[in-house]
Amino acid sequence: MTRLFKALLFSLLLALGVAGCGSVTVSAYQDQKPALDLRTYFNGTIDAWGMFQGRDGEVARRFKVVMDAKWTGDTGVLDEAFEWNDGTTSRRVWTLKRQPDGSYRGTADDVVGEAIGEVAGNAFHWRYVMALPVDGKVYHVDFDDWMFLMDDRVMLNRAAMSKWGVHLGDITLSFTKR
């Protein structure tokens, strides 16, 4: 390896490391109100409206979701029925489990492994890999998902999608509890 290449590689790795250190953690929202309790908010029927924007910001798809959610102890089932702007429908059923340390783990049929999340203040942050079908192929895409409770009925959600560290787009949702 040449010295120039080594220097460039070191600079790139250093820049990536510094960028990773600047990430916001959920604890930054510890004092924000109203305090979010997933078991309280995700209980009953919730309506949501959302959109997917590609990395250029253009809205590529819009959707409505009706979620039926219920908890038994520390285990919650969130049954989501999607209606997309092209008339297609889909369904995702999440199973969430509150852990002894207060964190959450979640599974769904199209989630690879487990989603892992934490709550602090009015915020819920979780990460997971989703198997997304696109044009007959399935891609494993990373989700960095943030939810913020605005009041007892409204929650806002933004998820950044990436593959191999490359930003693919964002999903934005507004939840309204009935």
Segments and roles (model prediction):
Residues G22-T25:
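Bacterial signal peptide processing site
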Residues S27, V65, W71, D145, ...:
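Sequence-level preference for short, compositionally simple segments enriched
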Residues M1-L9:
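Bacterial N-terminal signal peptides that target proteins for export
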Residues D144-R178:
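Glycine-rich, aromatic-bearing surface loops/beta-hairpins
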Residues G17-G20:
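C-terminal motif of bacterial Sec signal peptides marking the signal peptidase cleavage site
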Residues Y29-T45:
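N-terminal helix-cap/turn-to-beta initiation motif at the start of protein domains
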Residues W49, Q53-V134:
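Central antiparallel beta-sheet cores of small beta-barrel/beta-sandwich binding domains
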Residues V59-V65, V138-F143, H167-G169:
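Amphipathic hydrophobic-ligand
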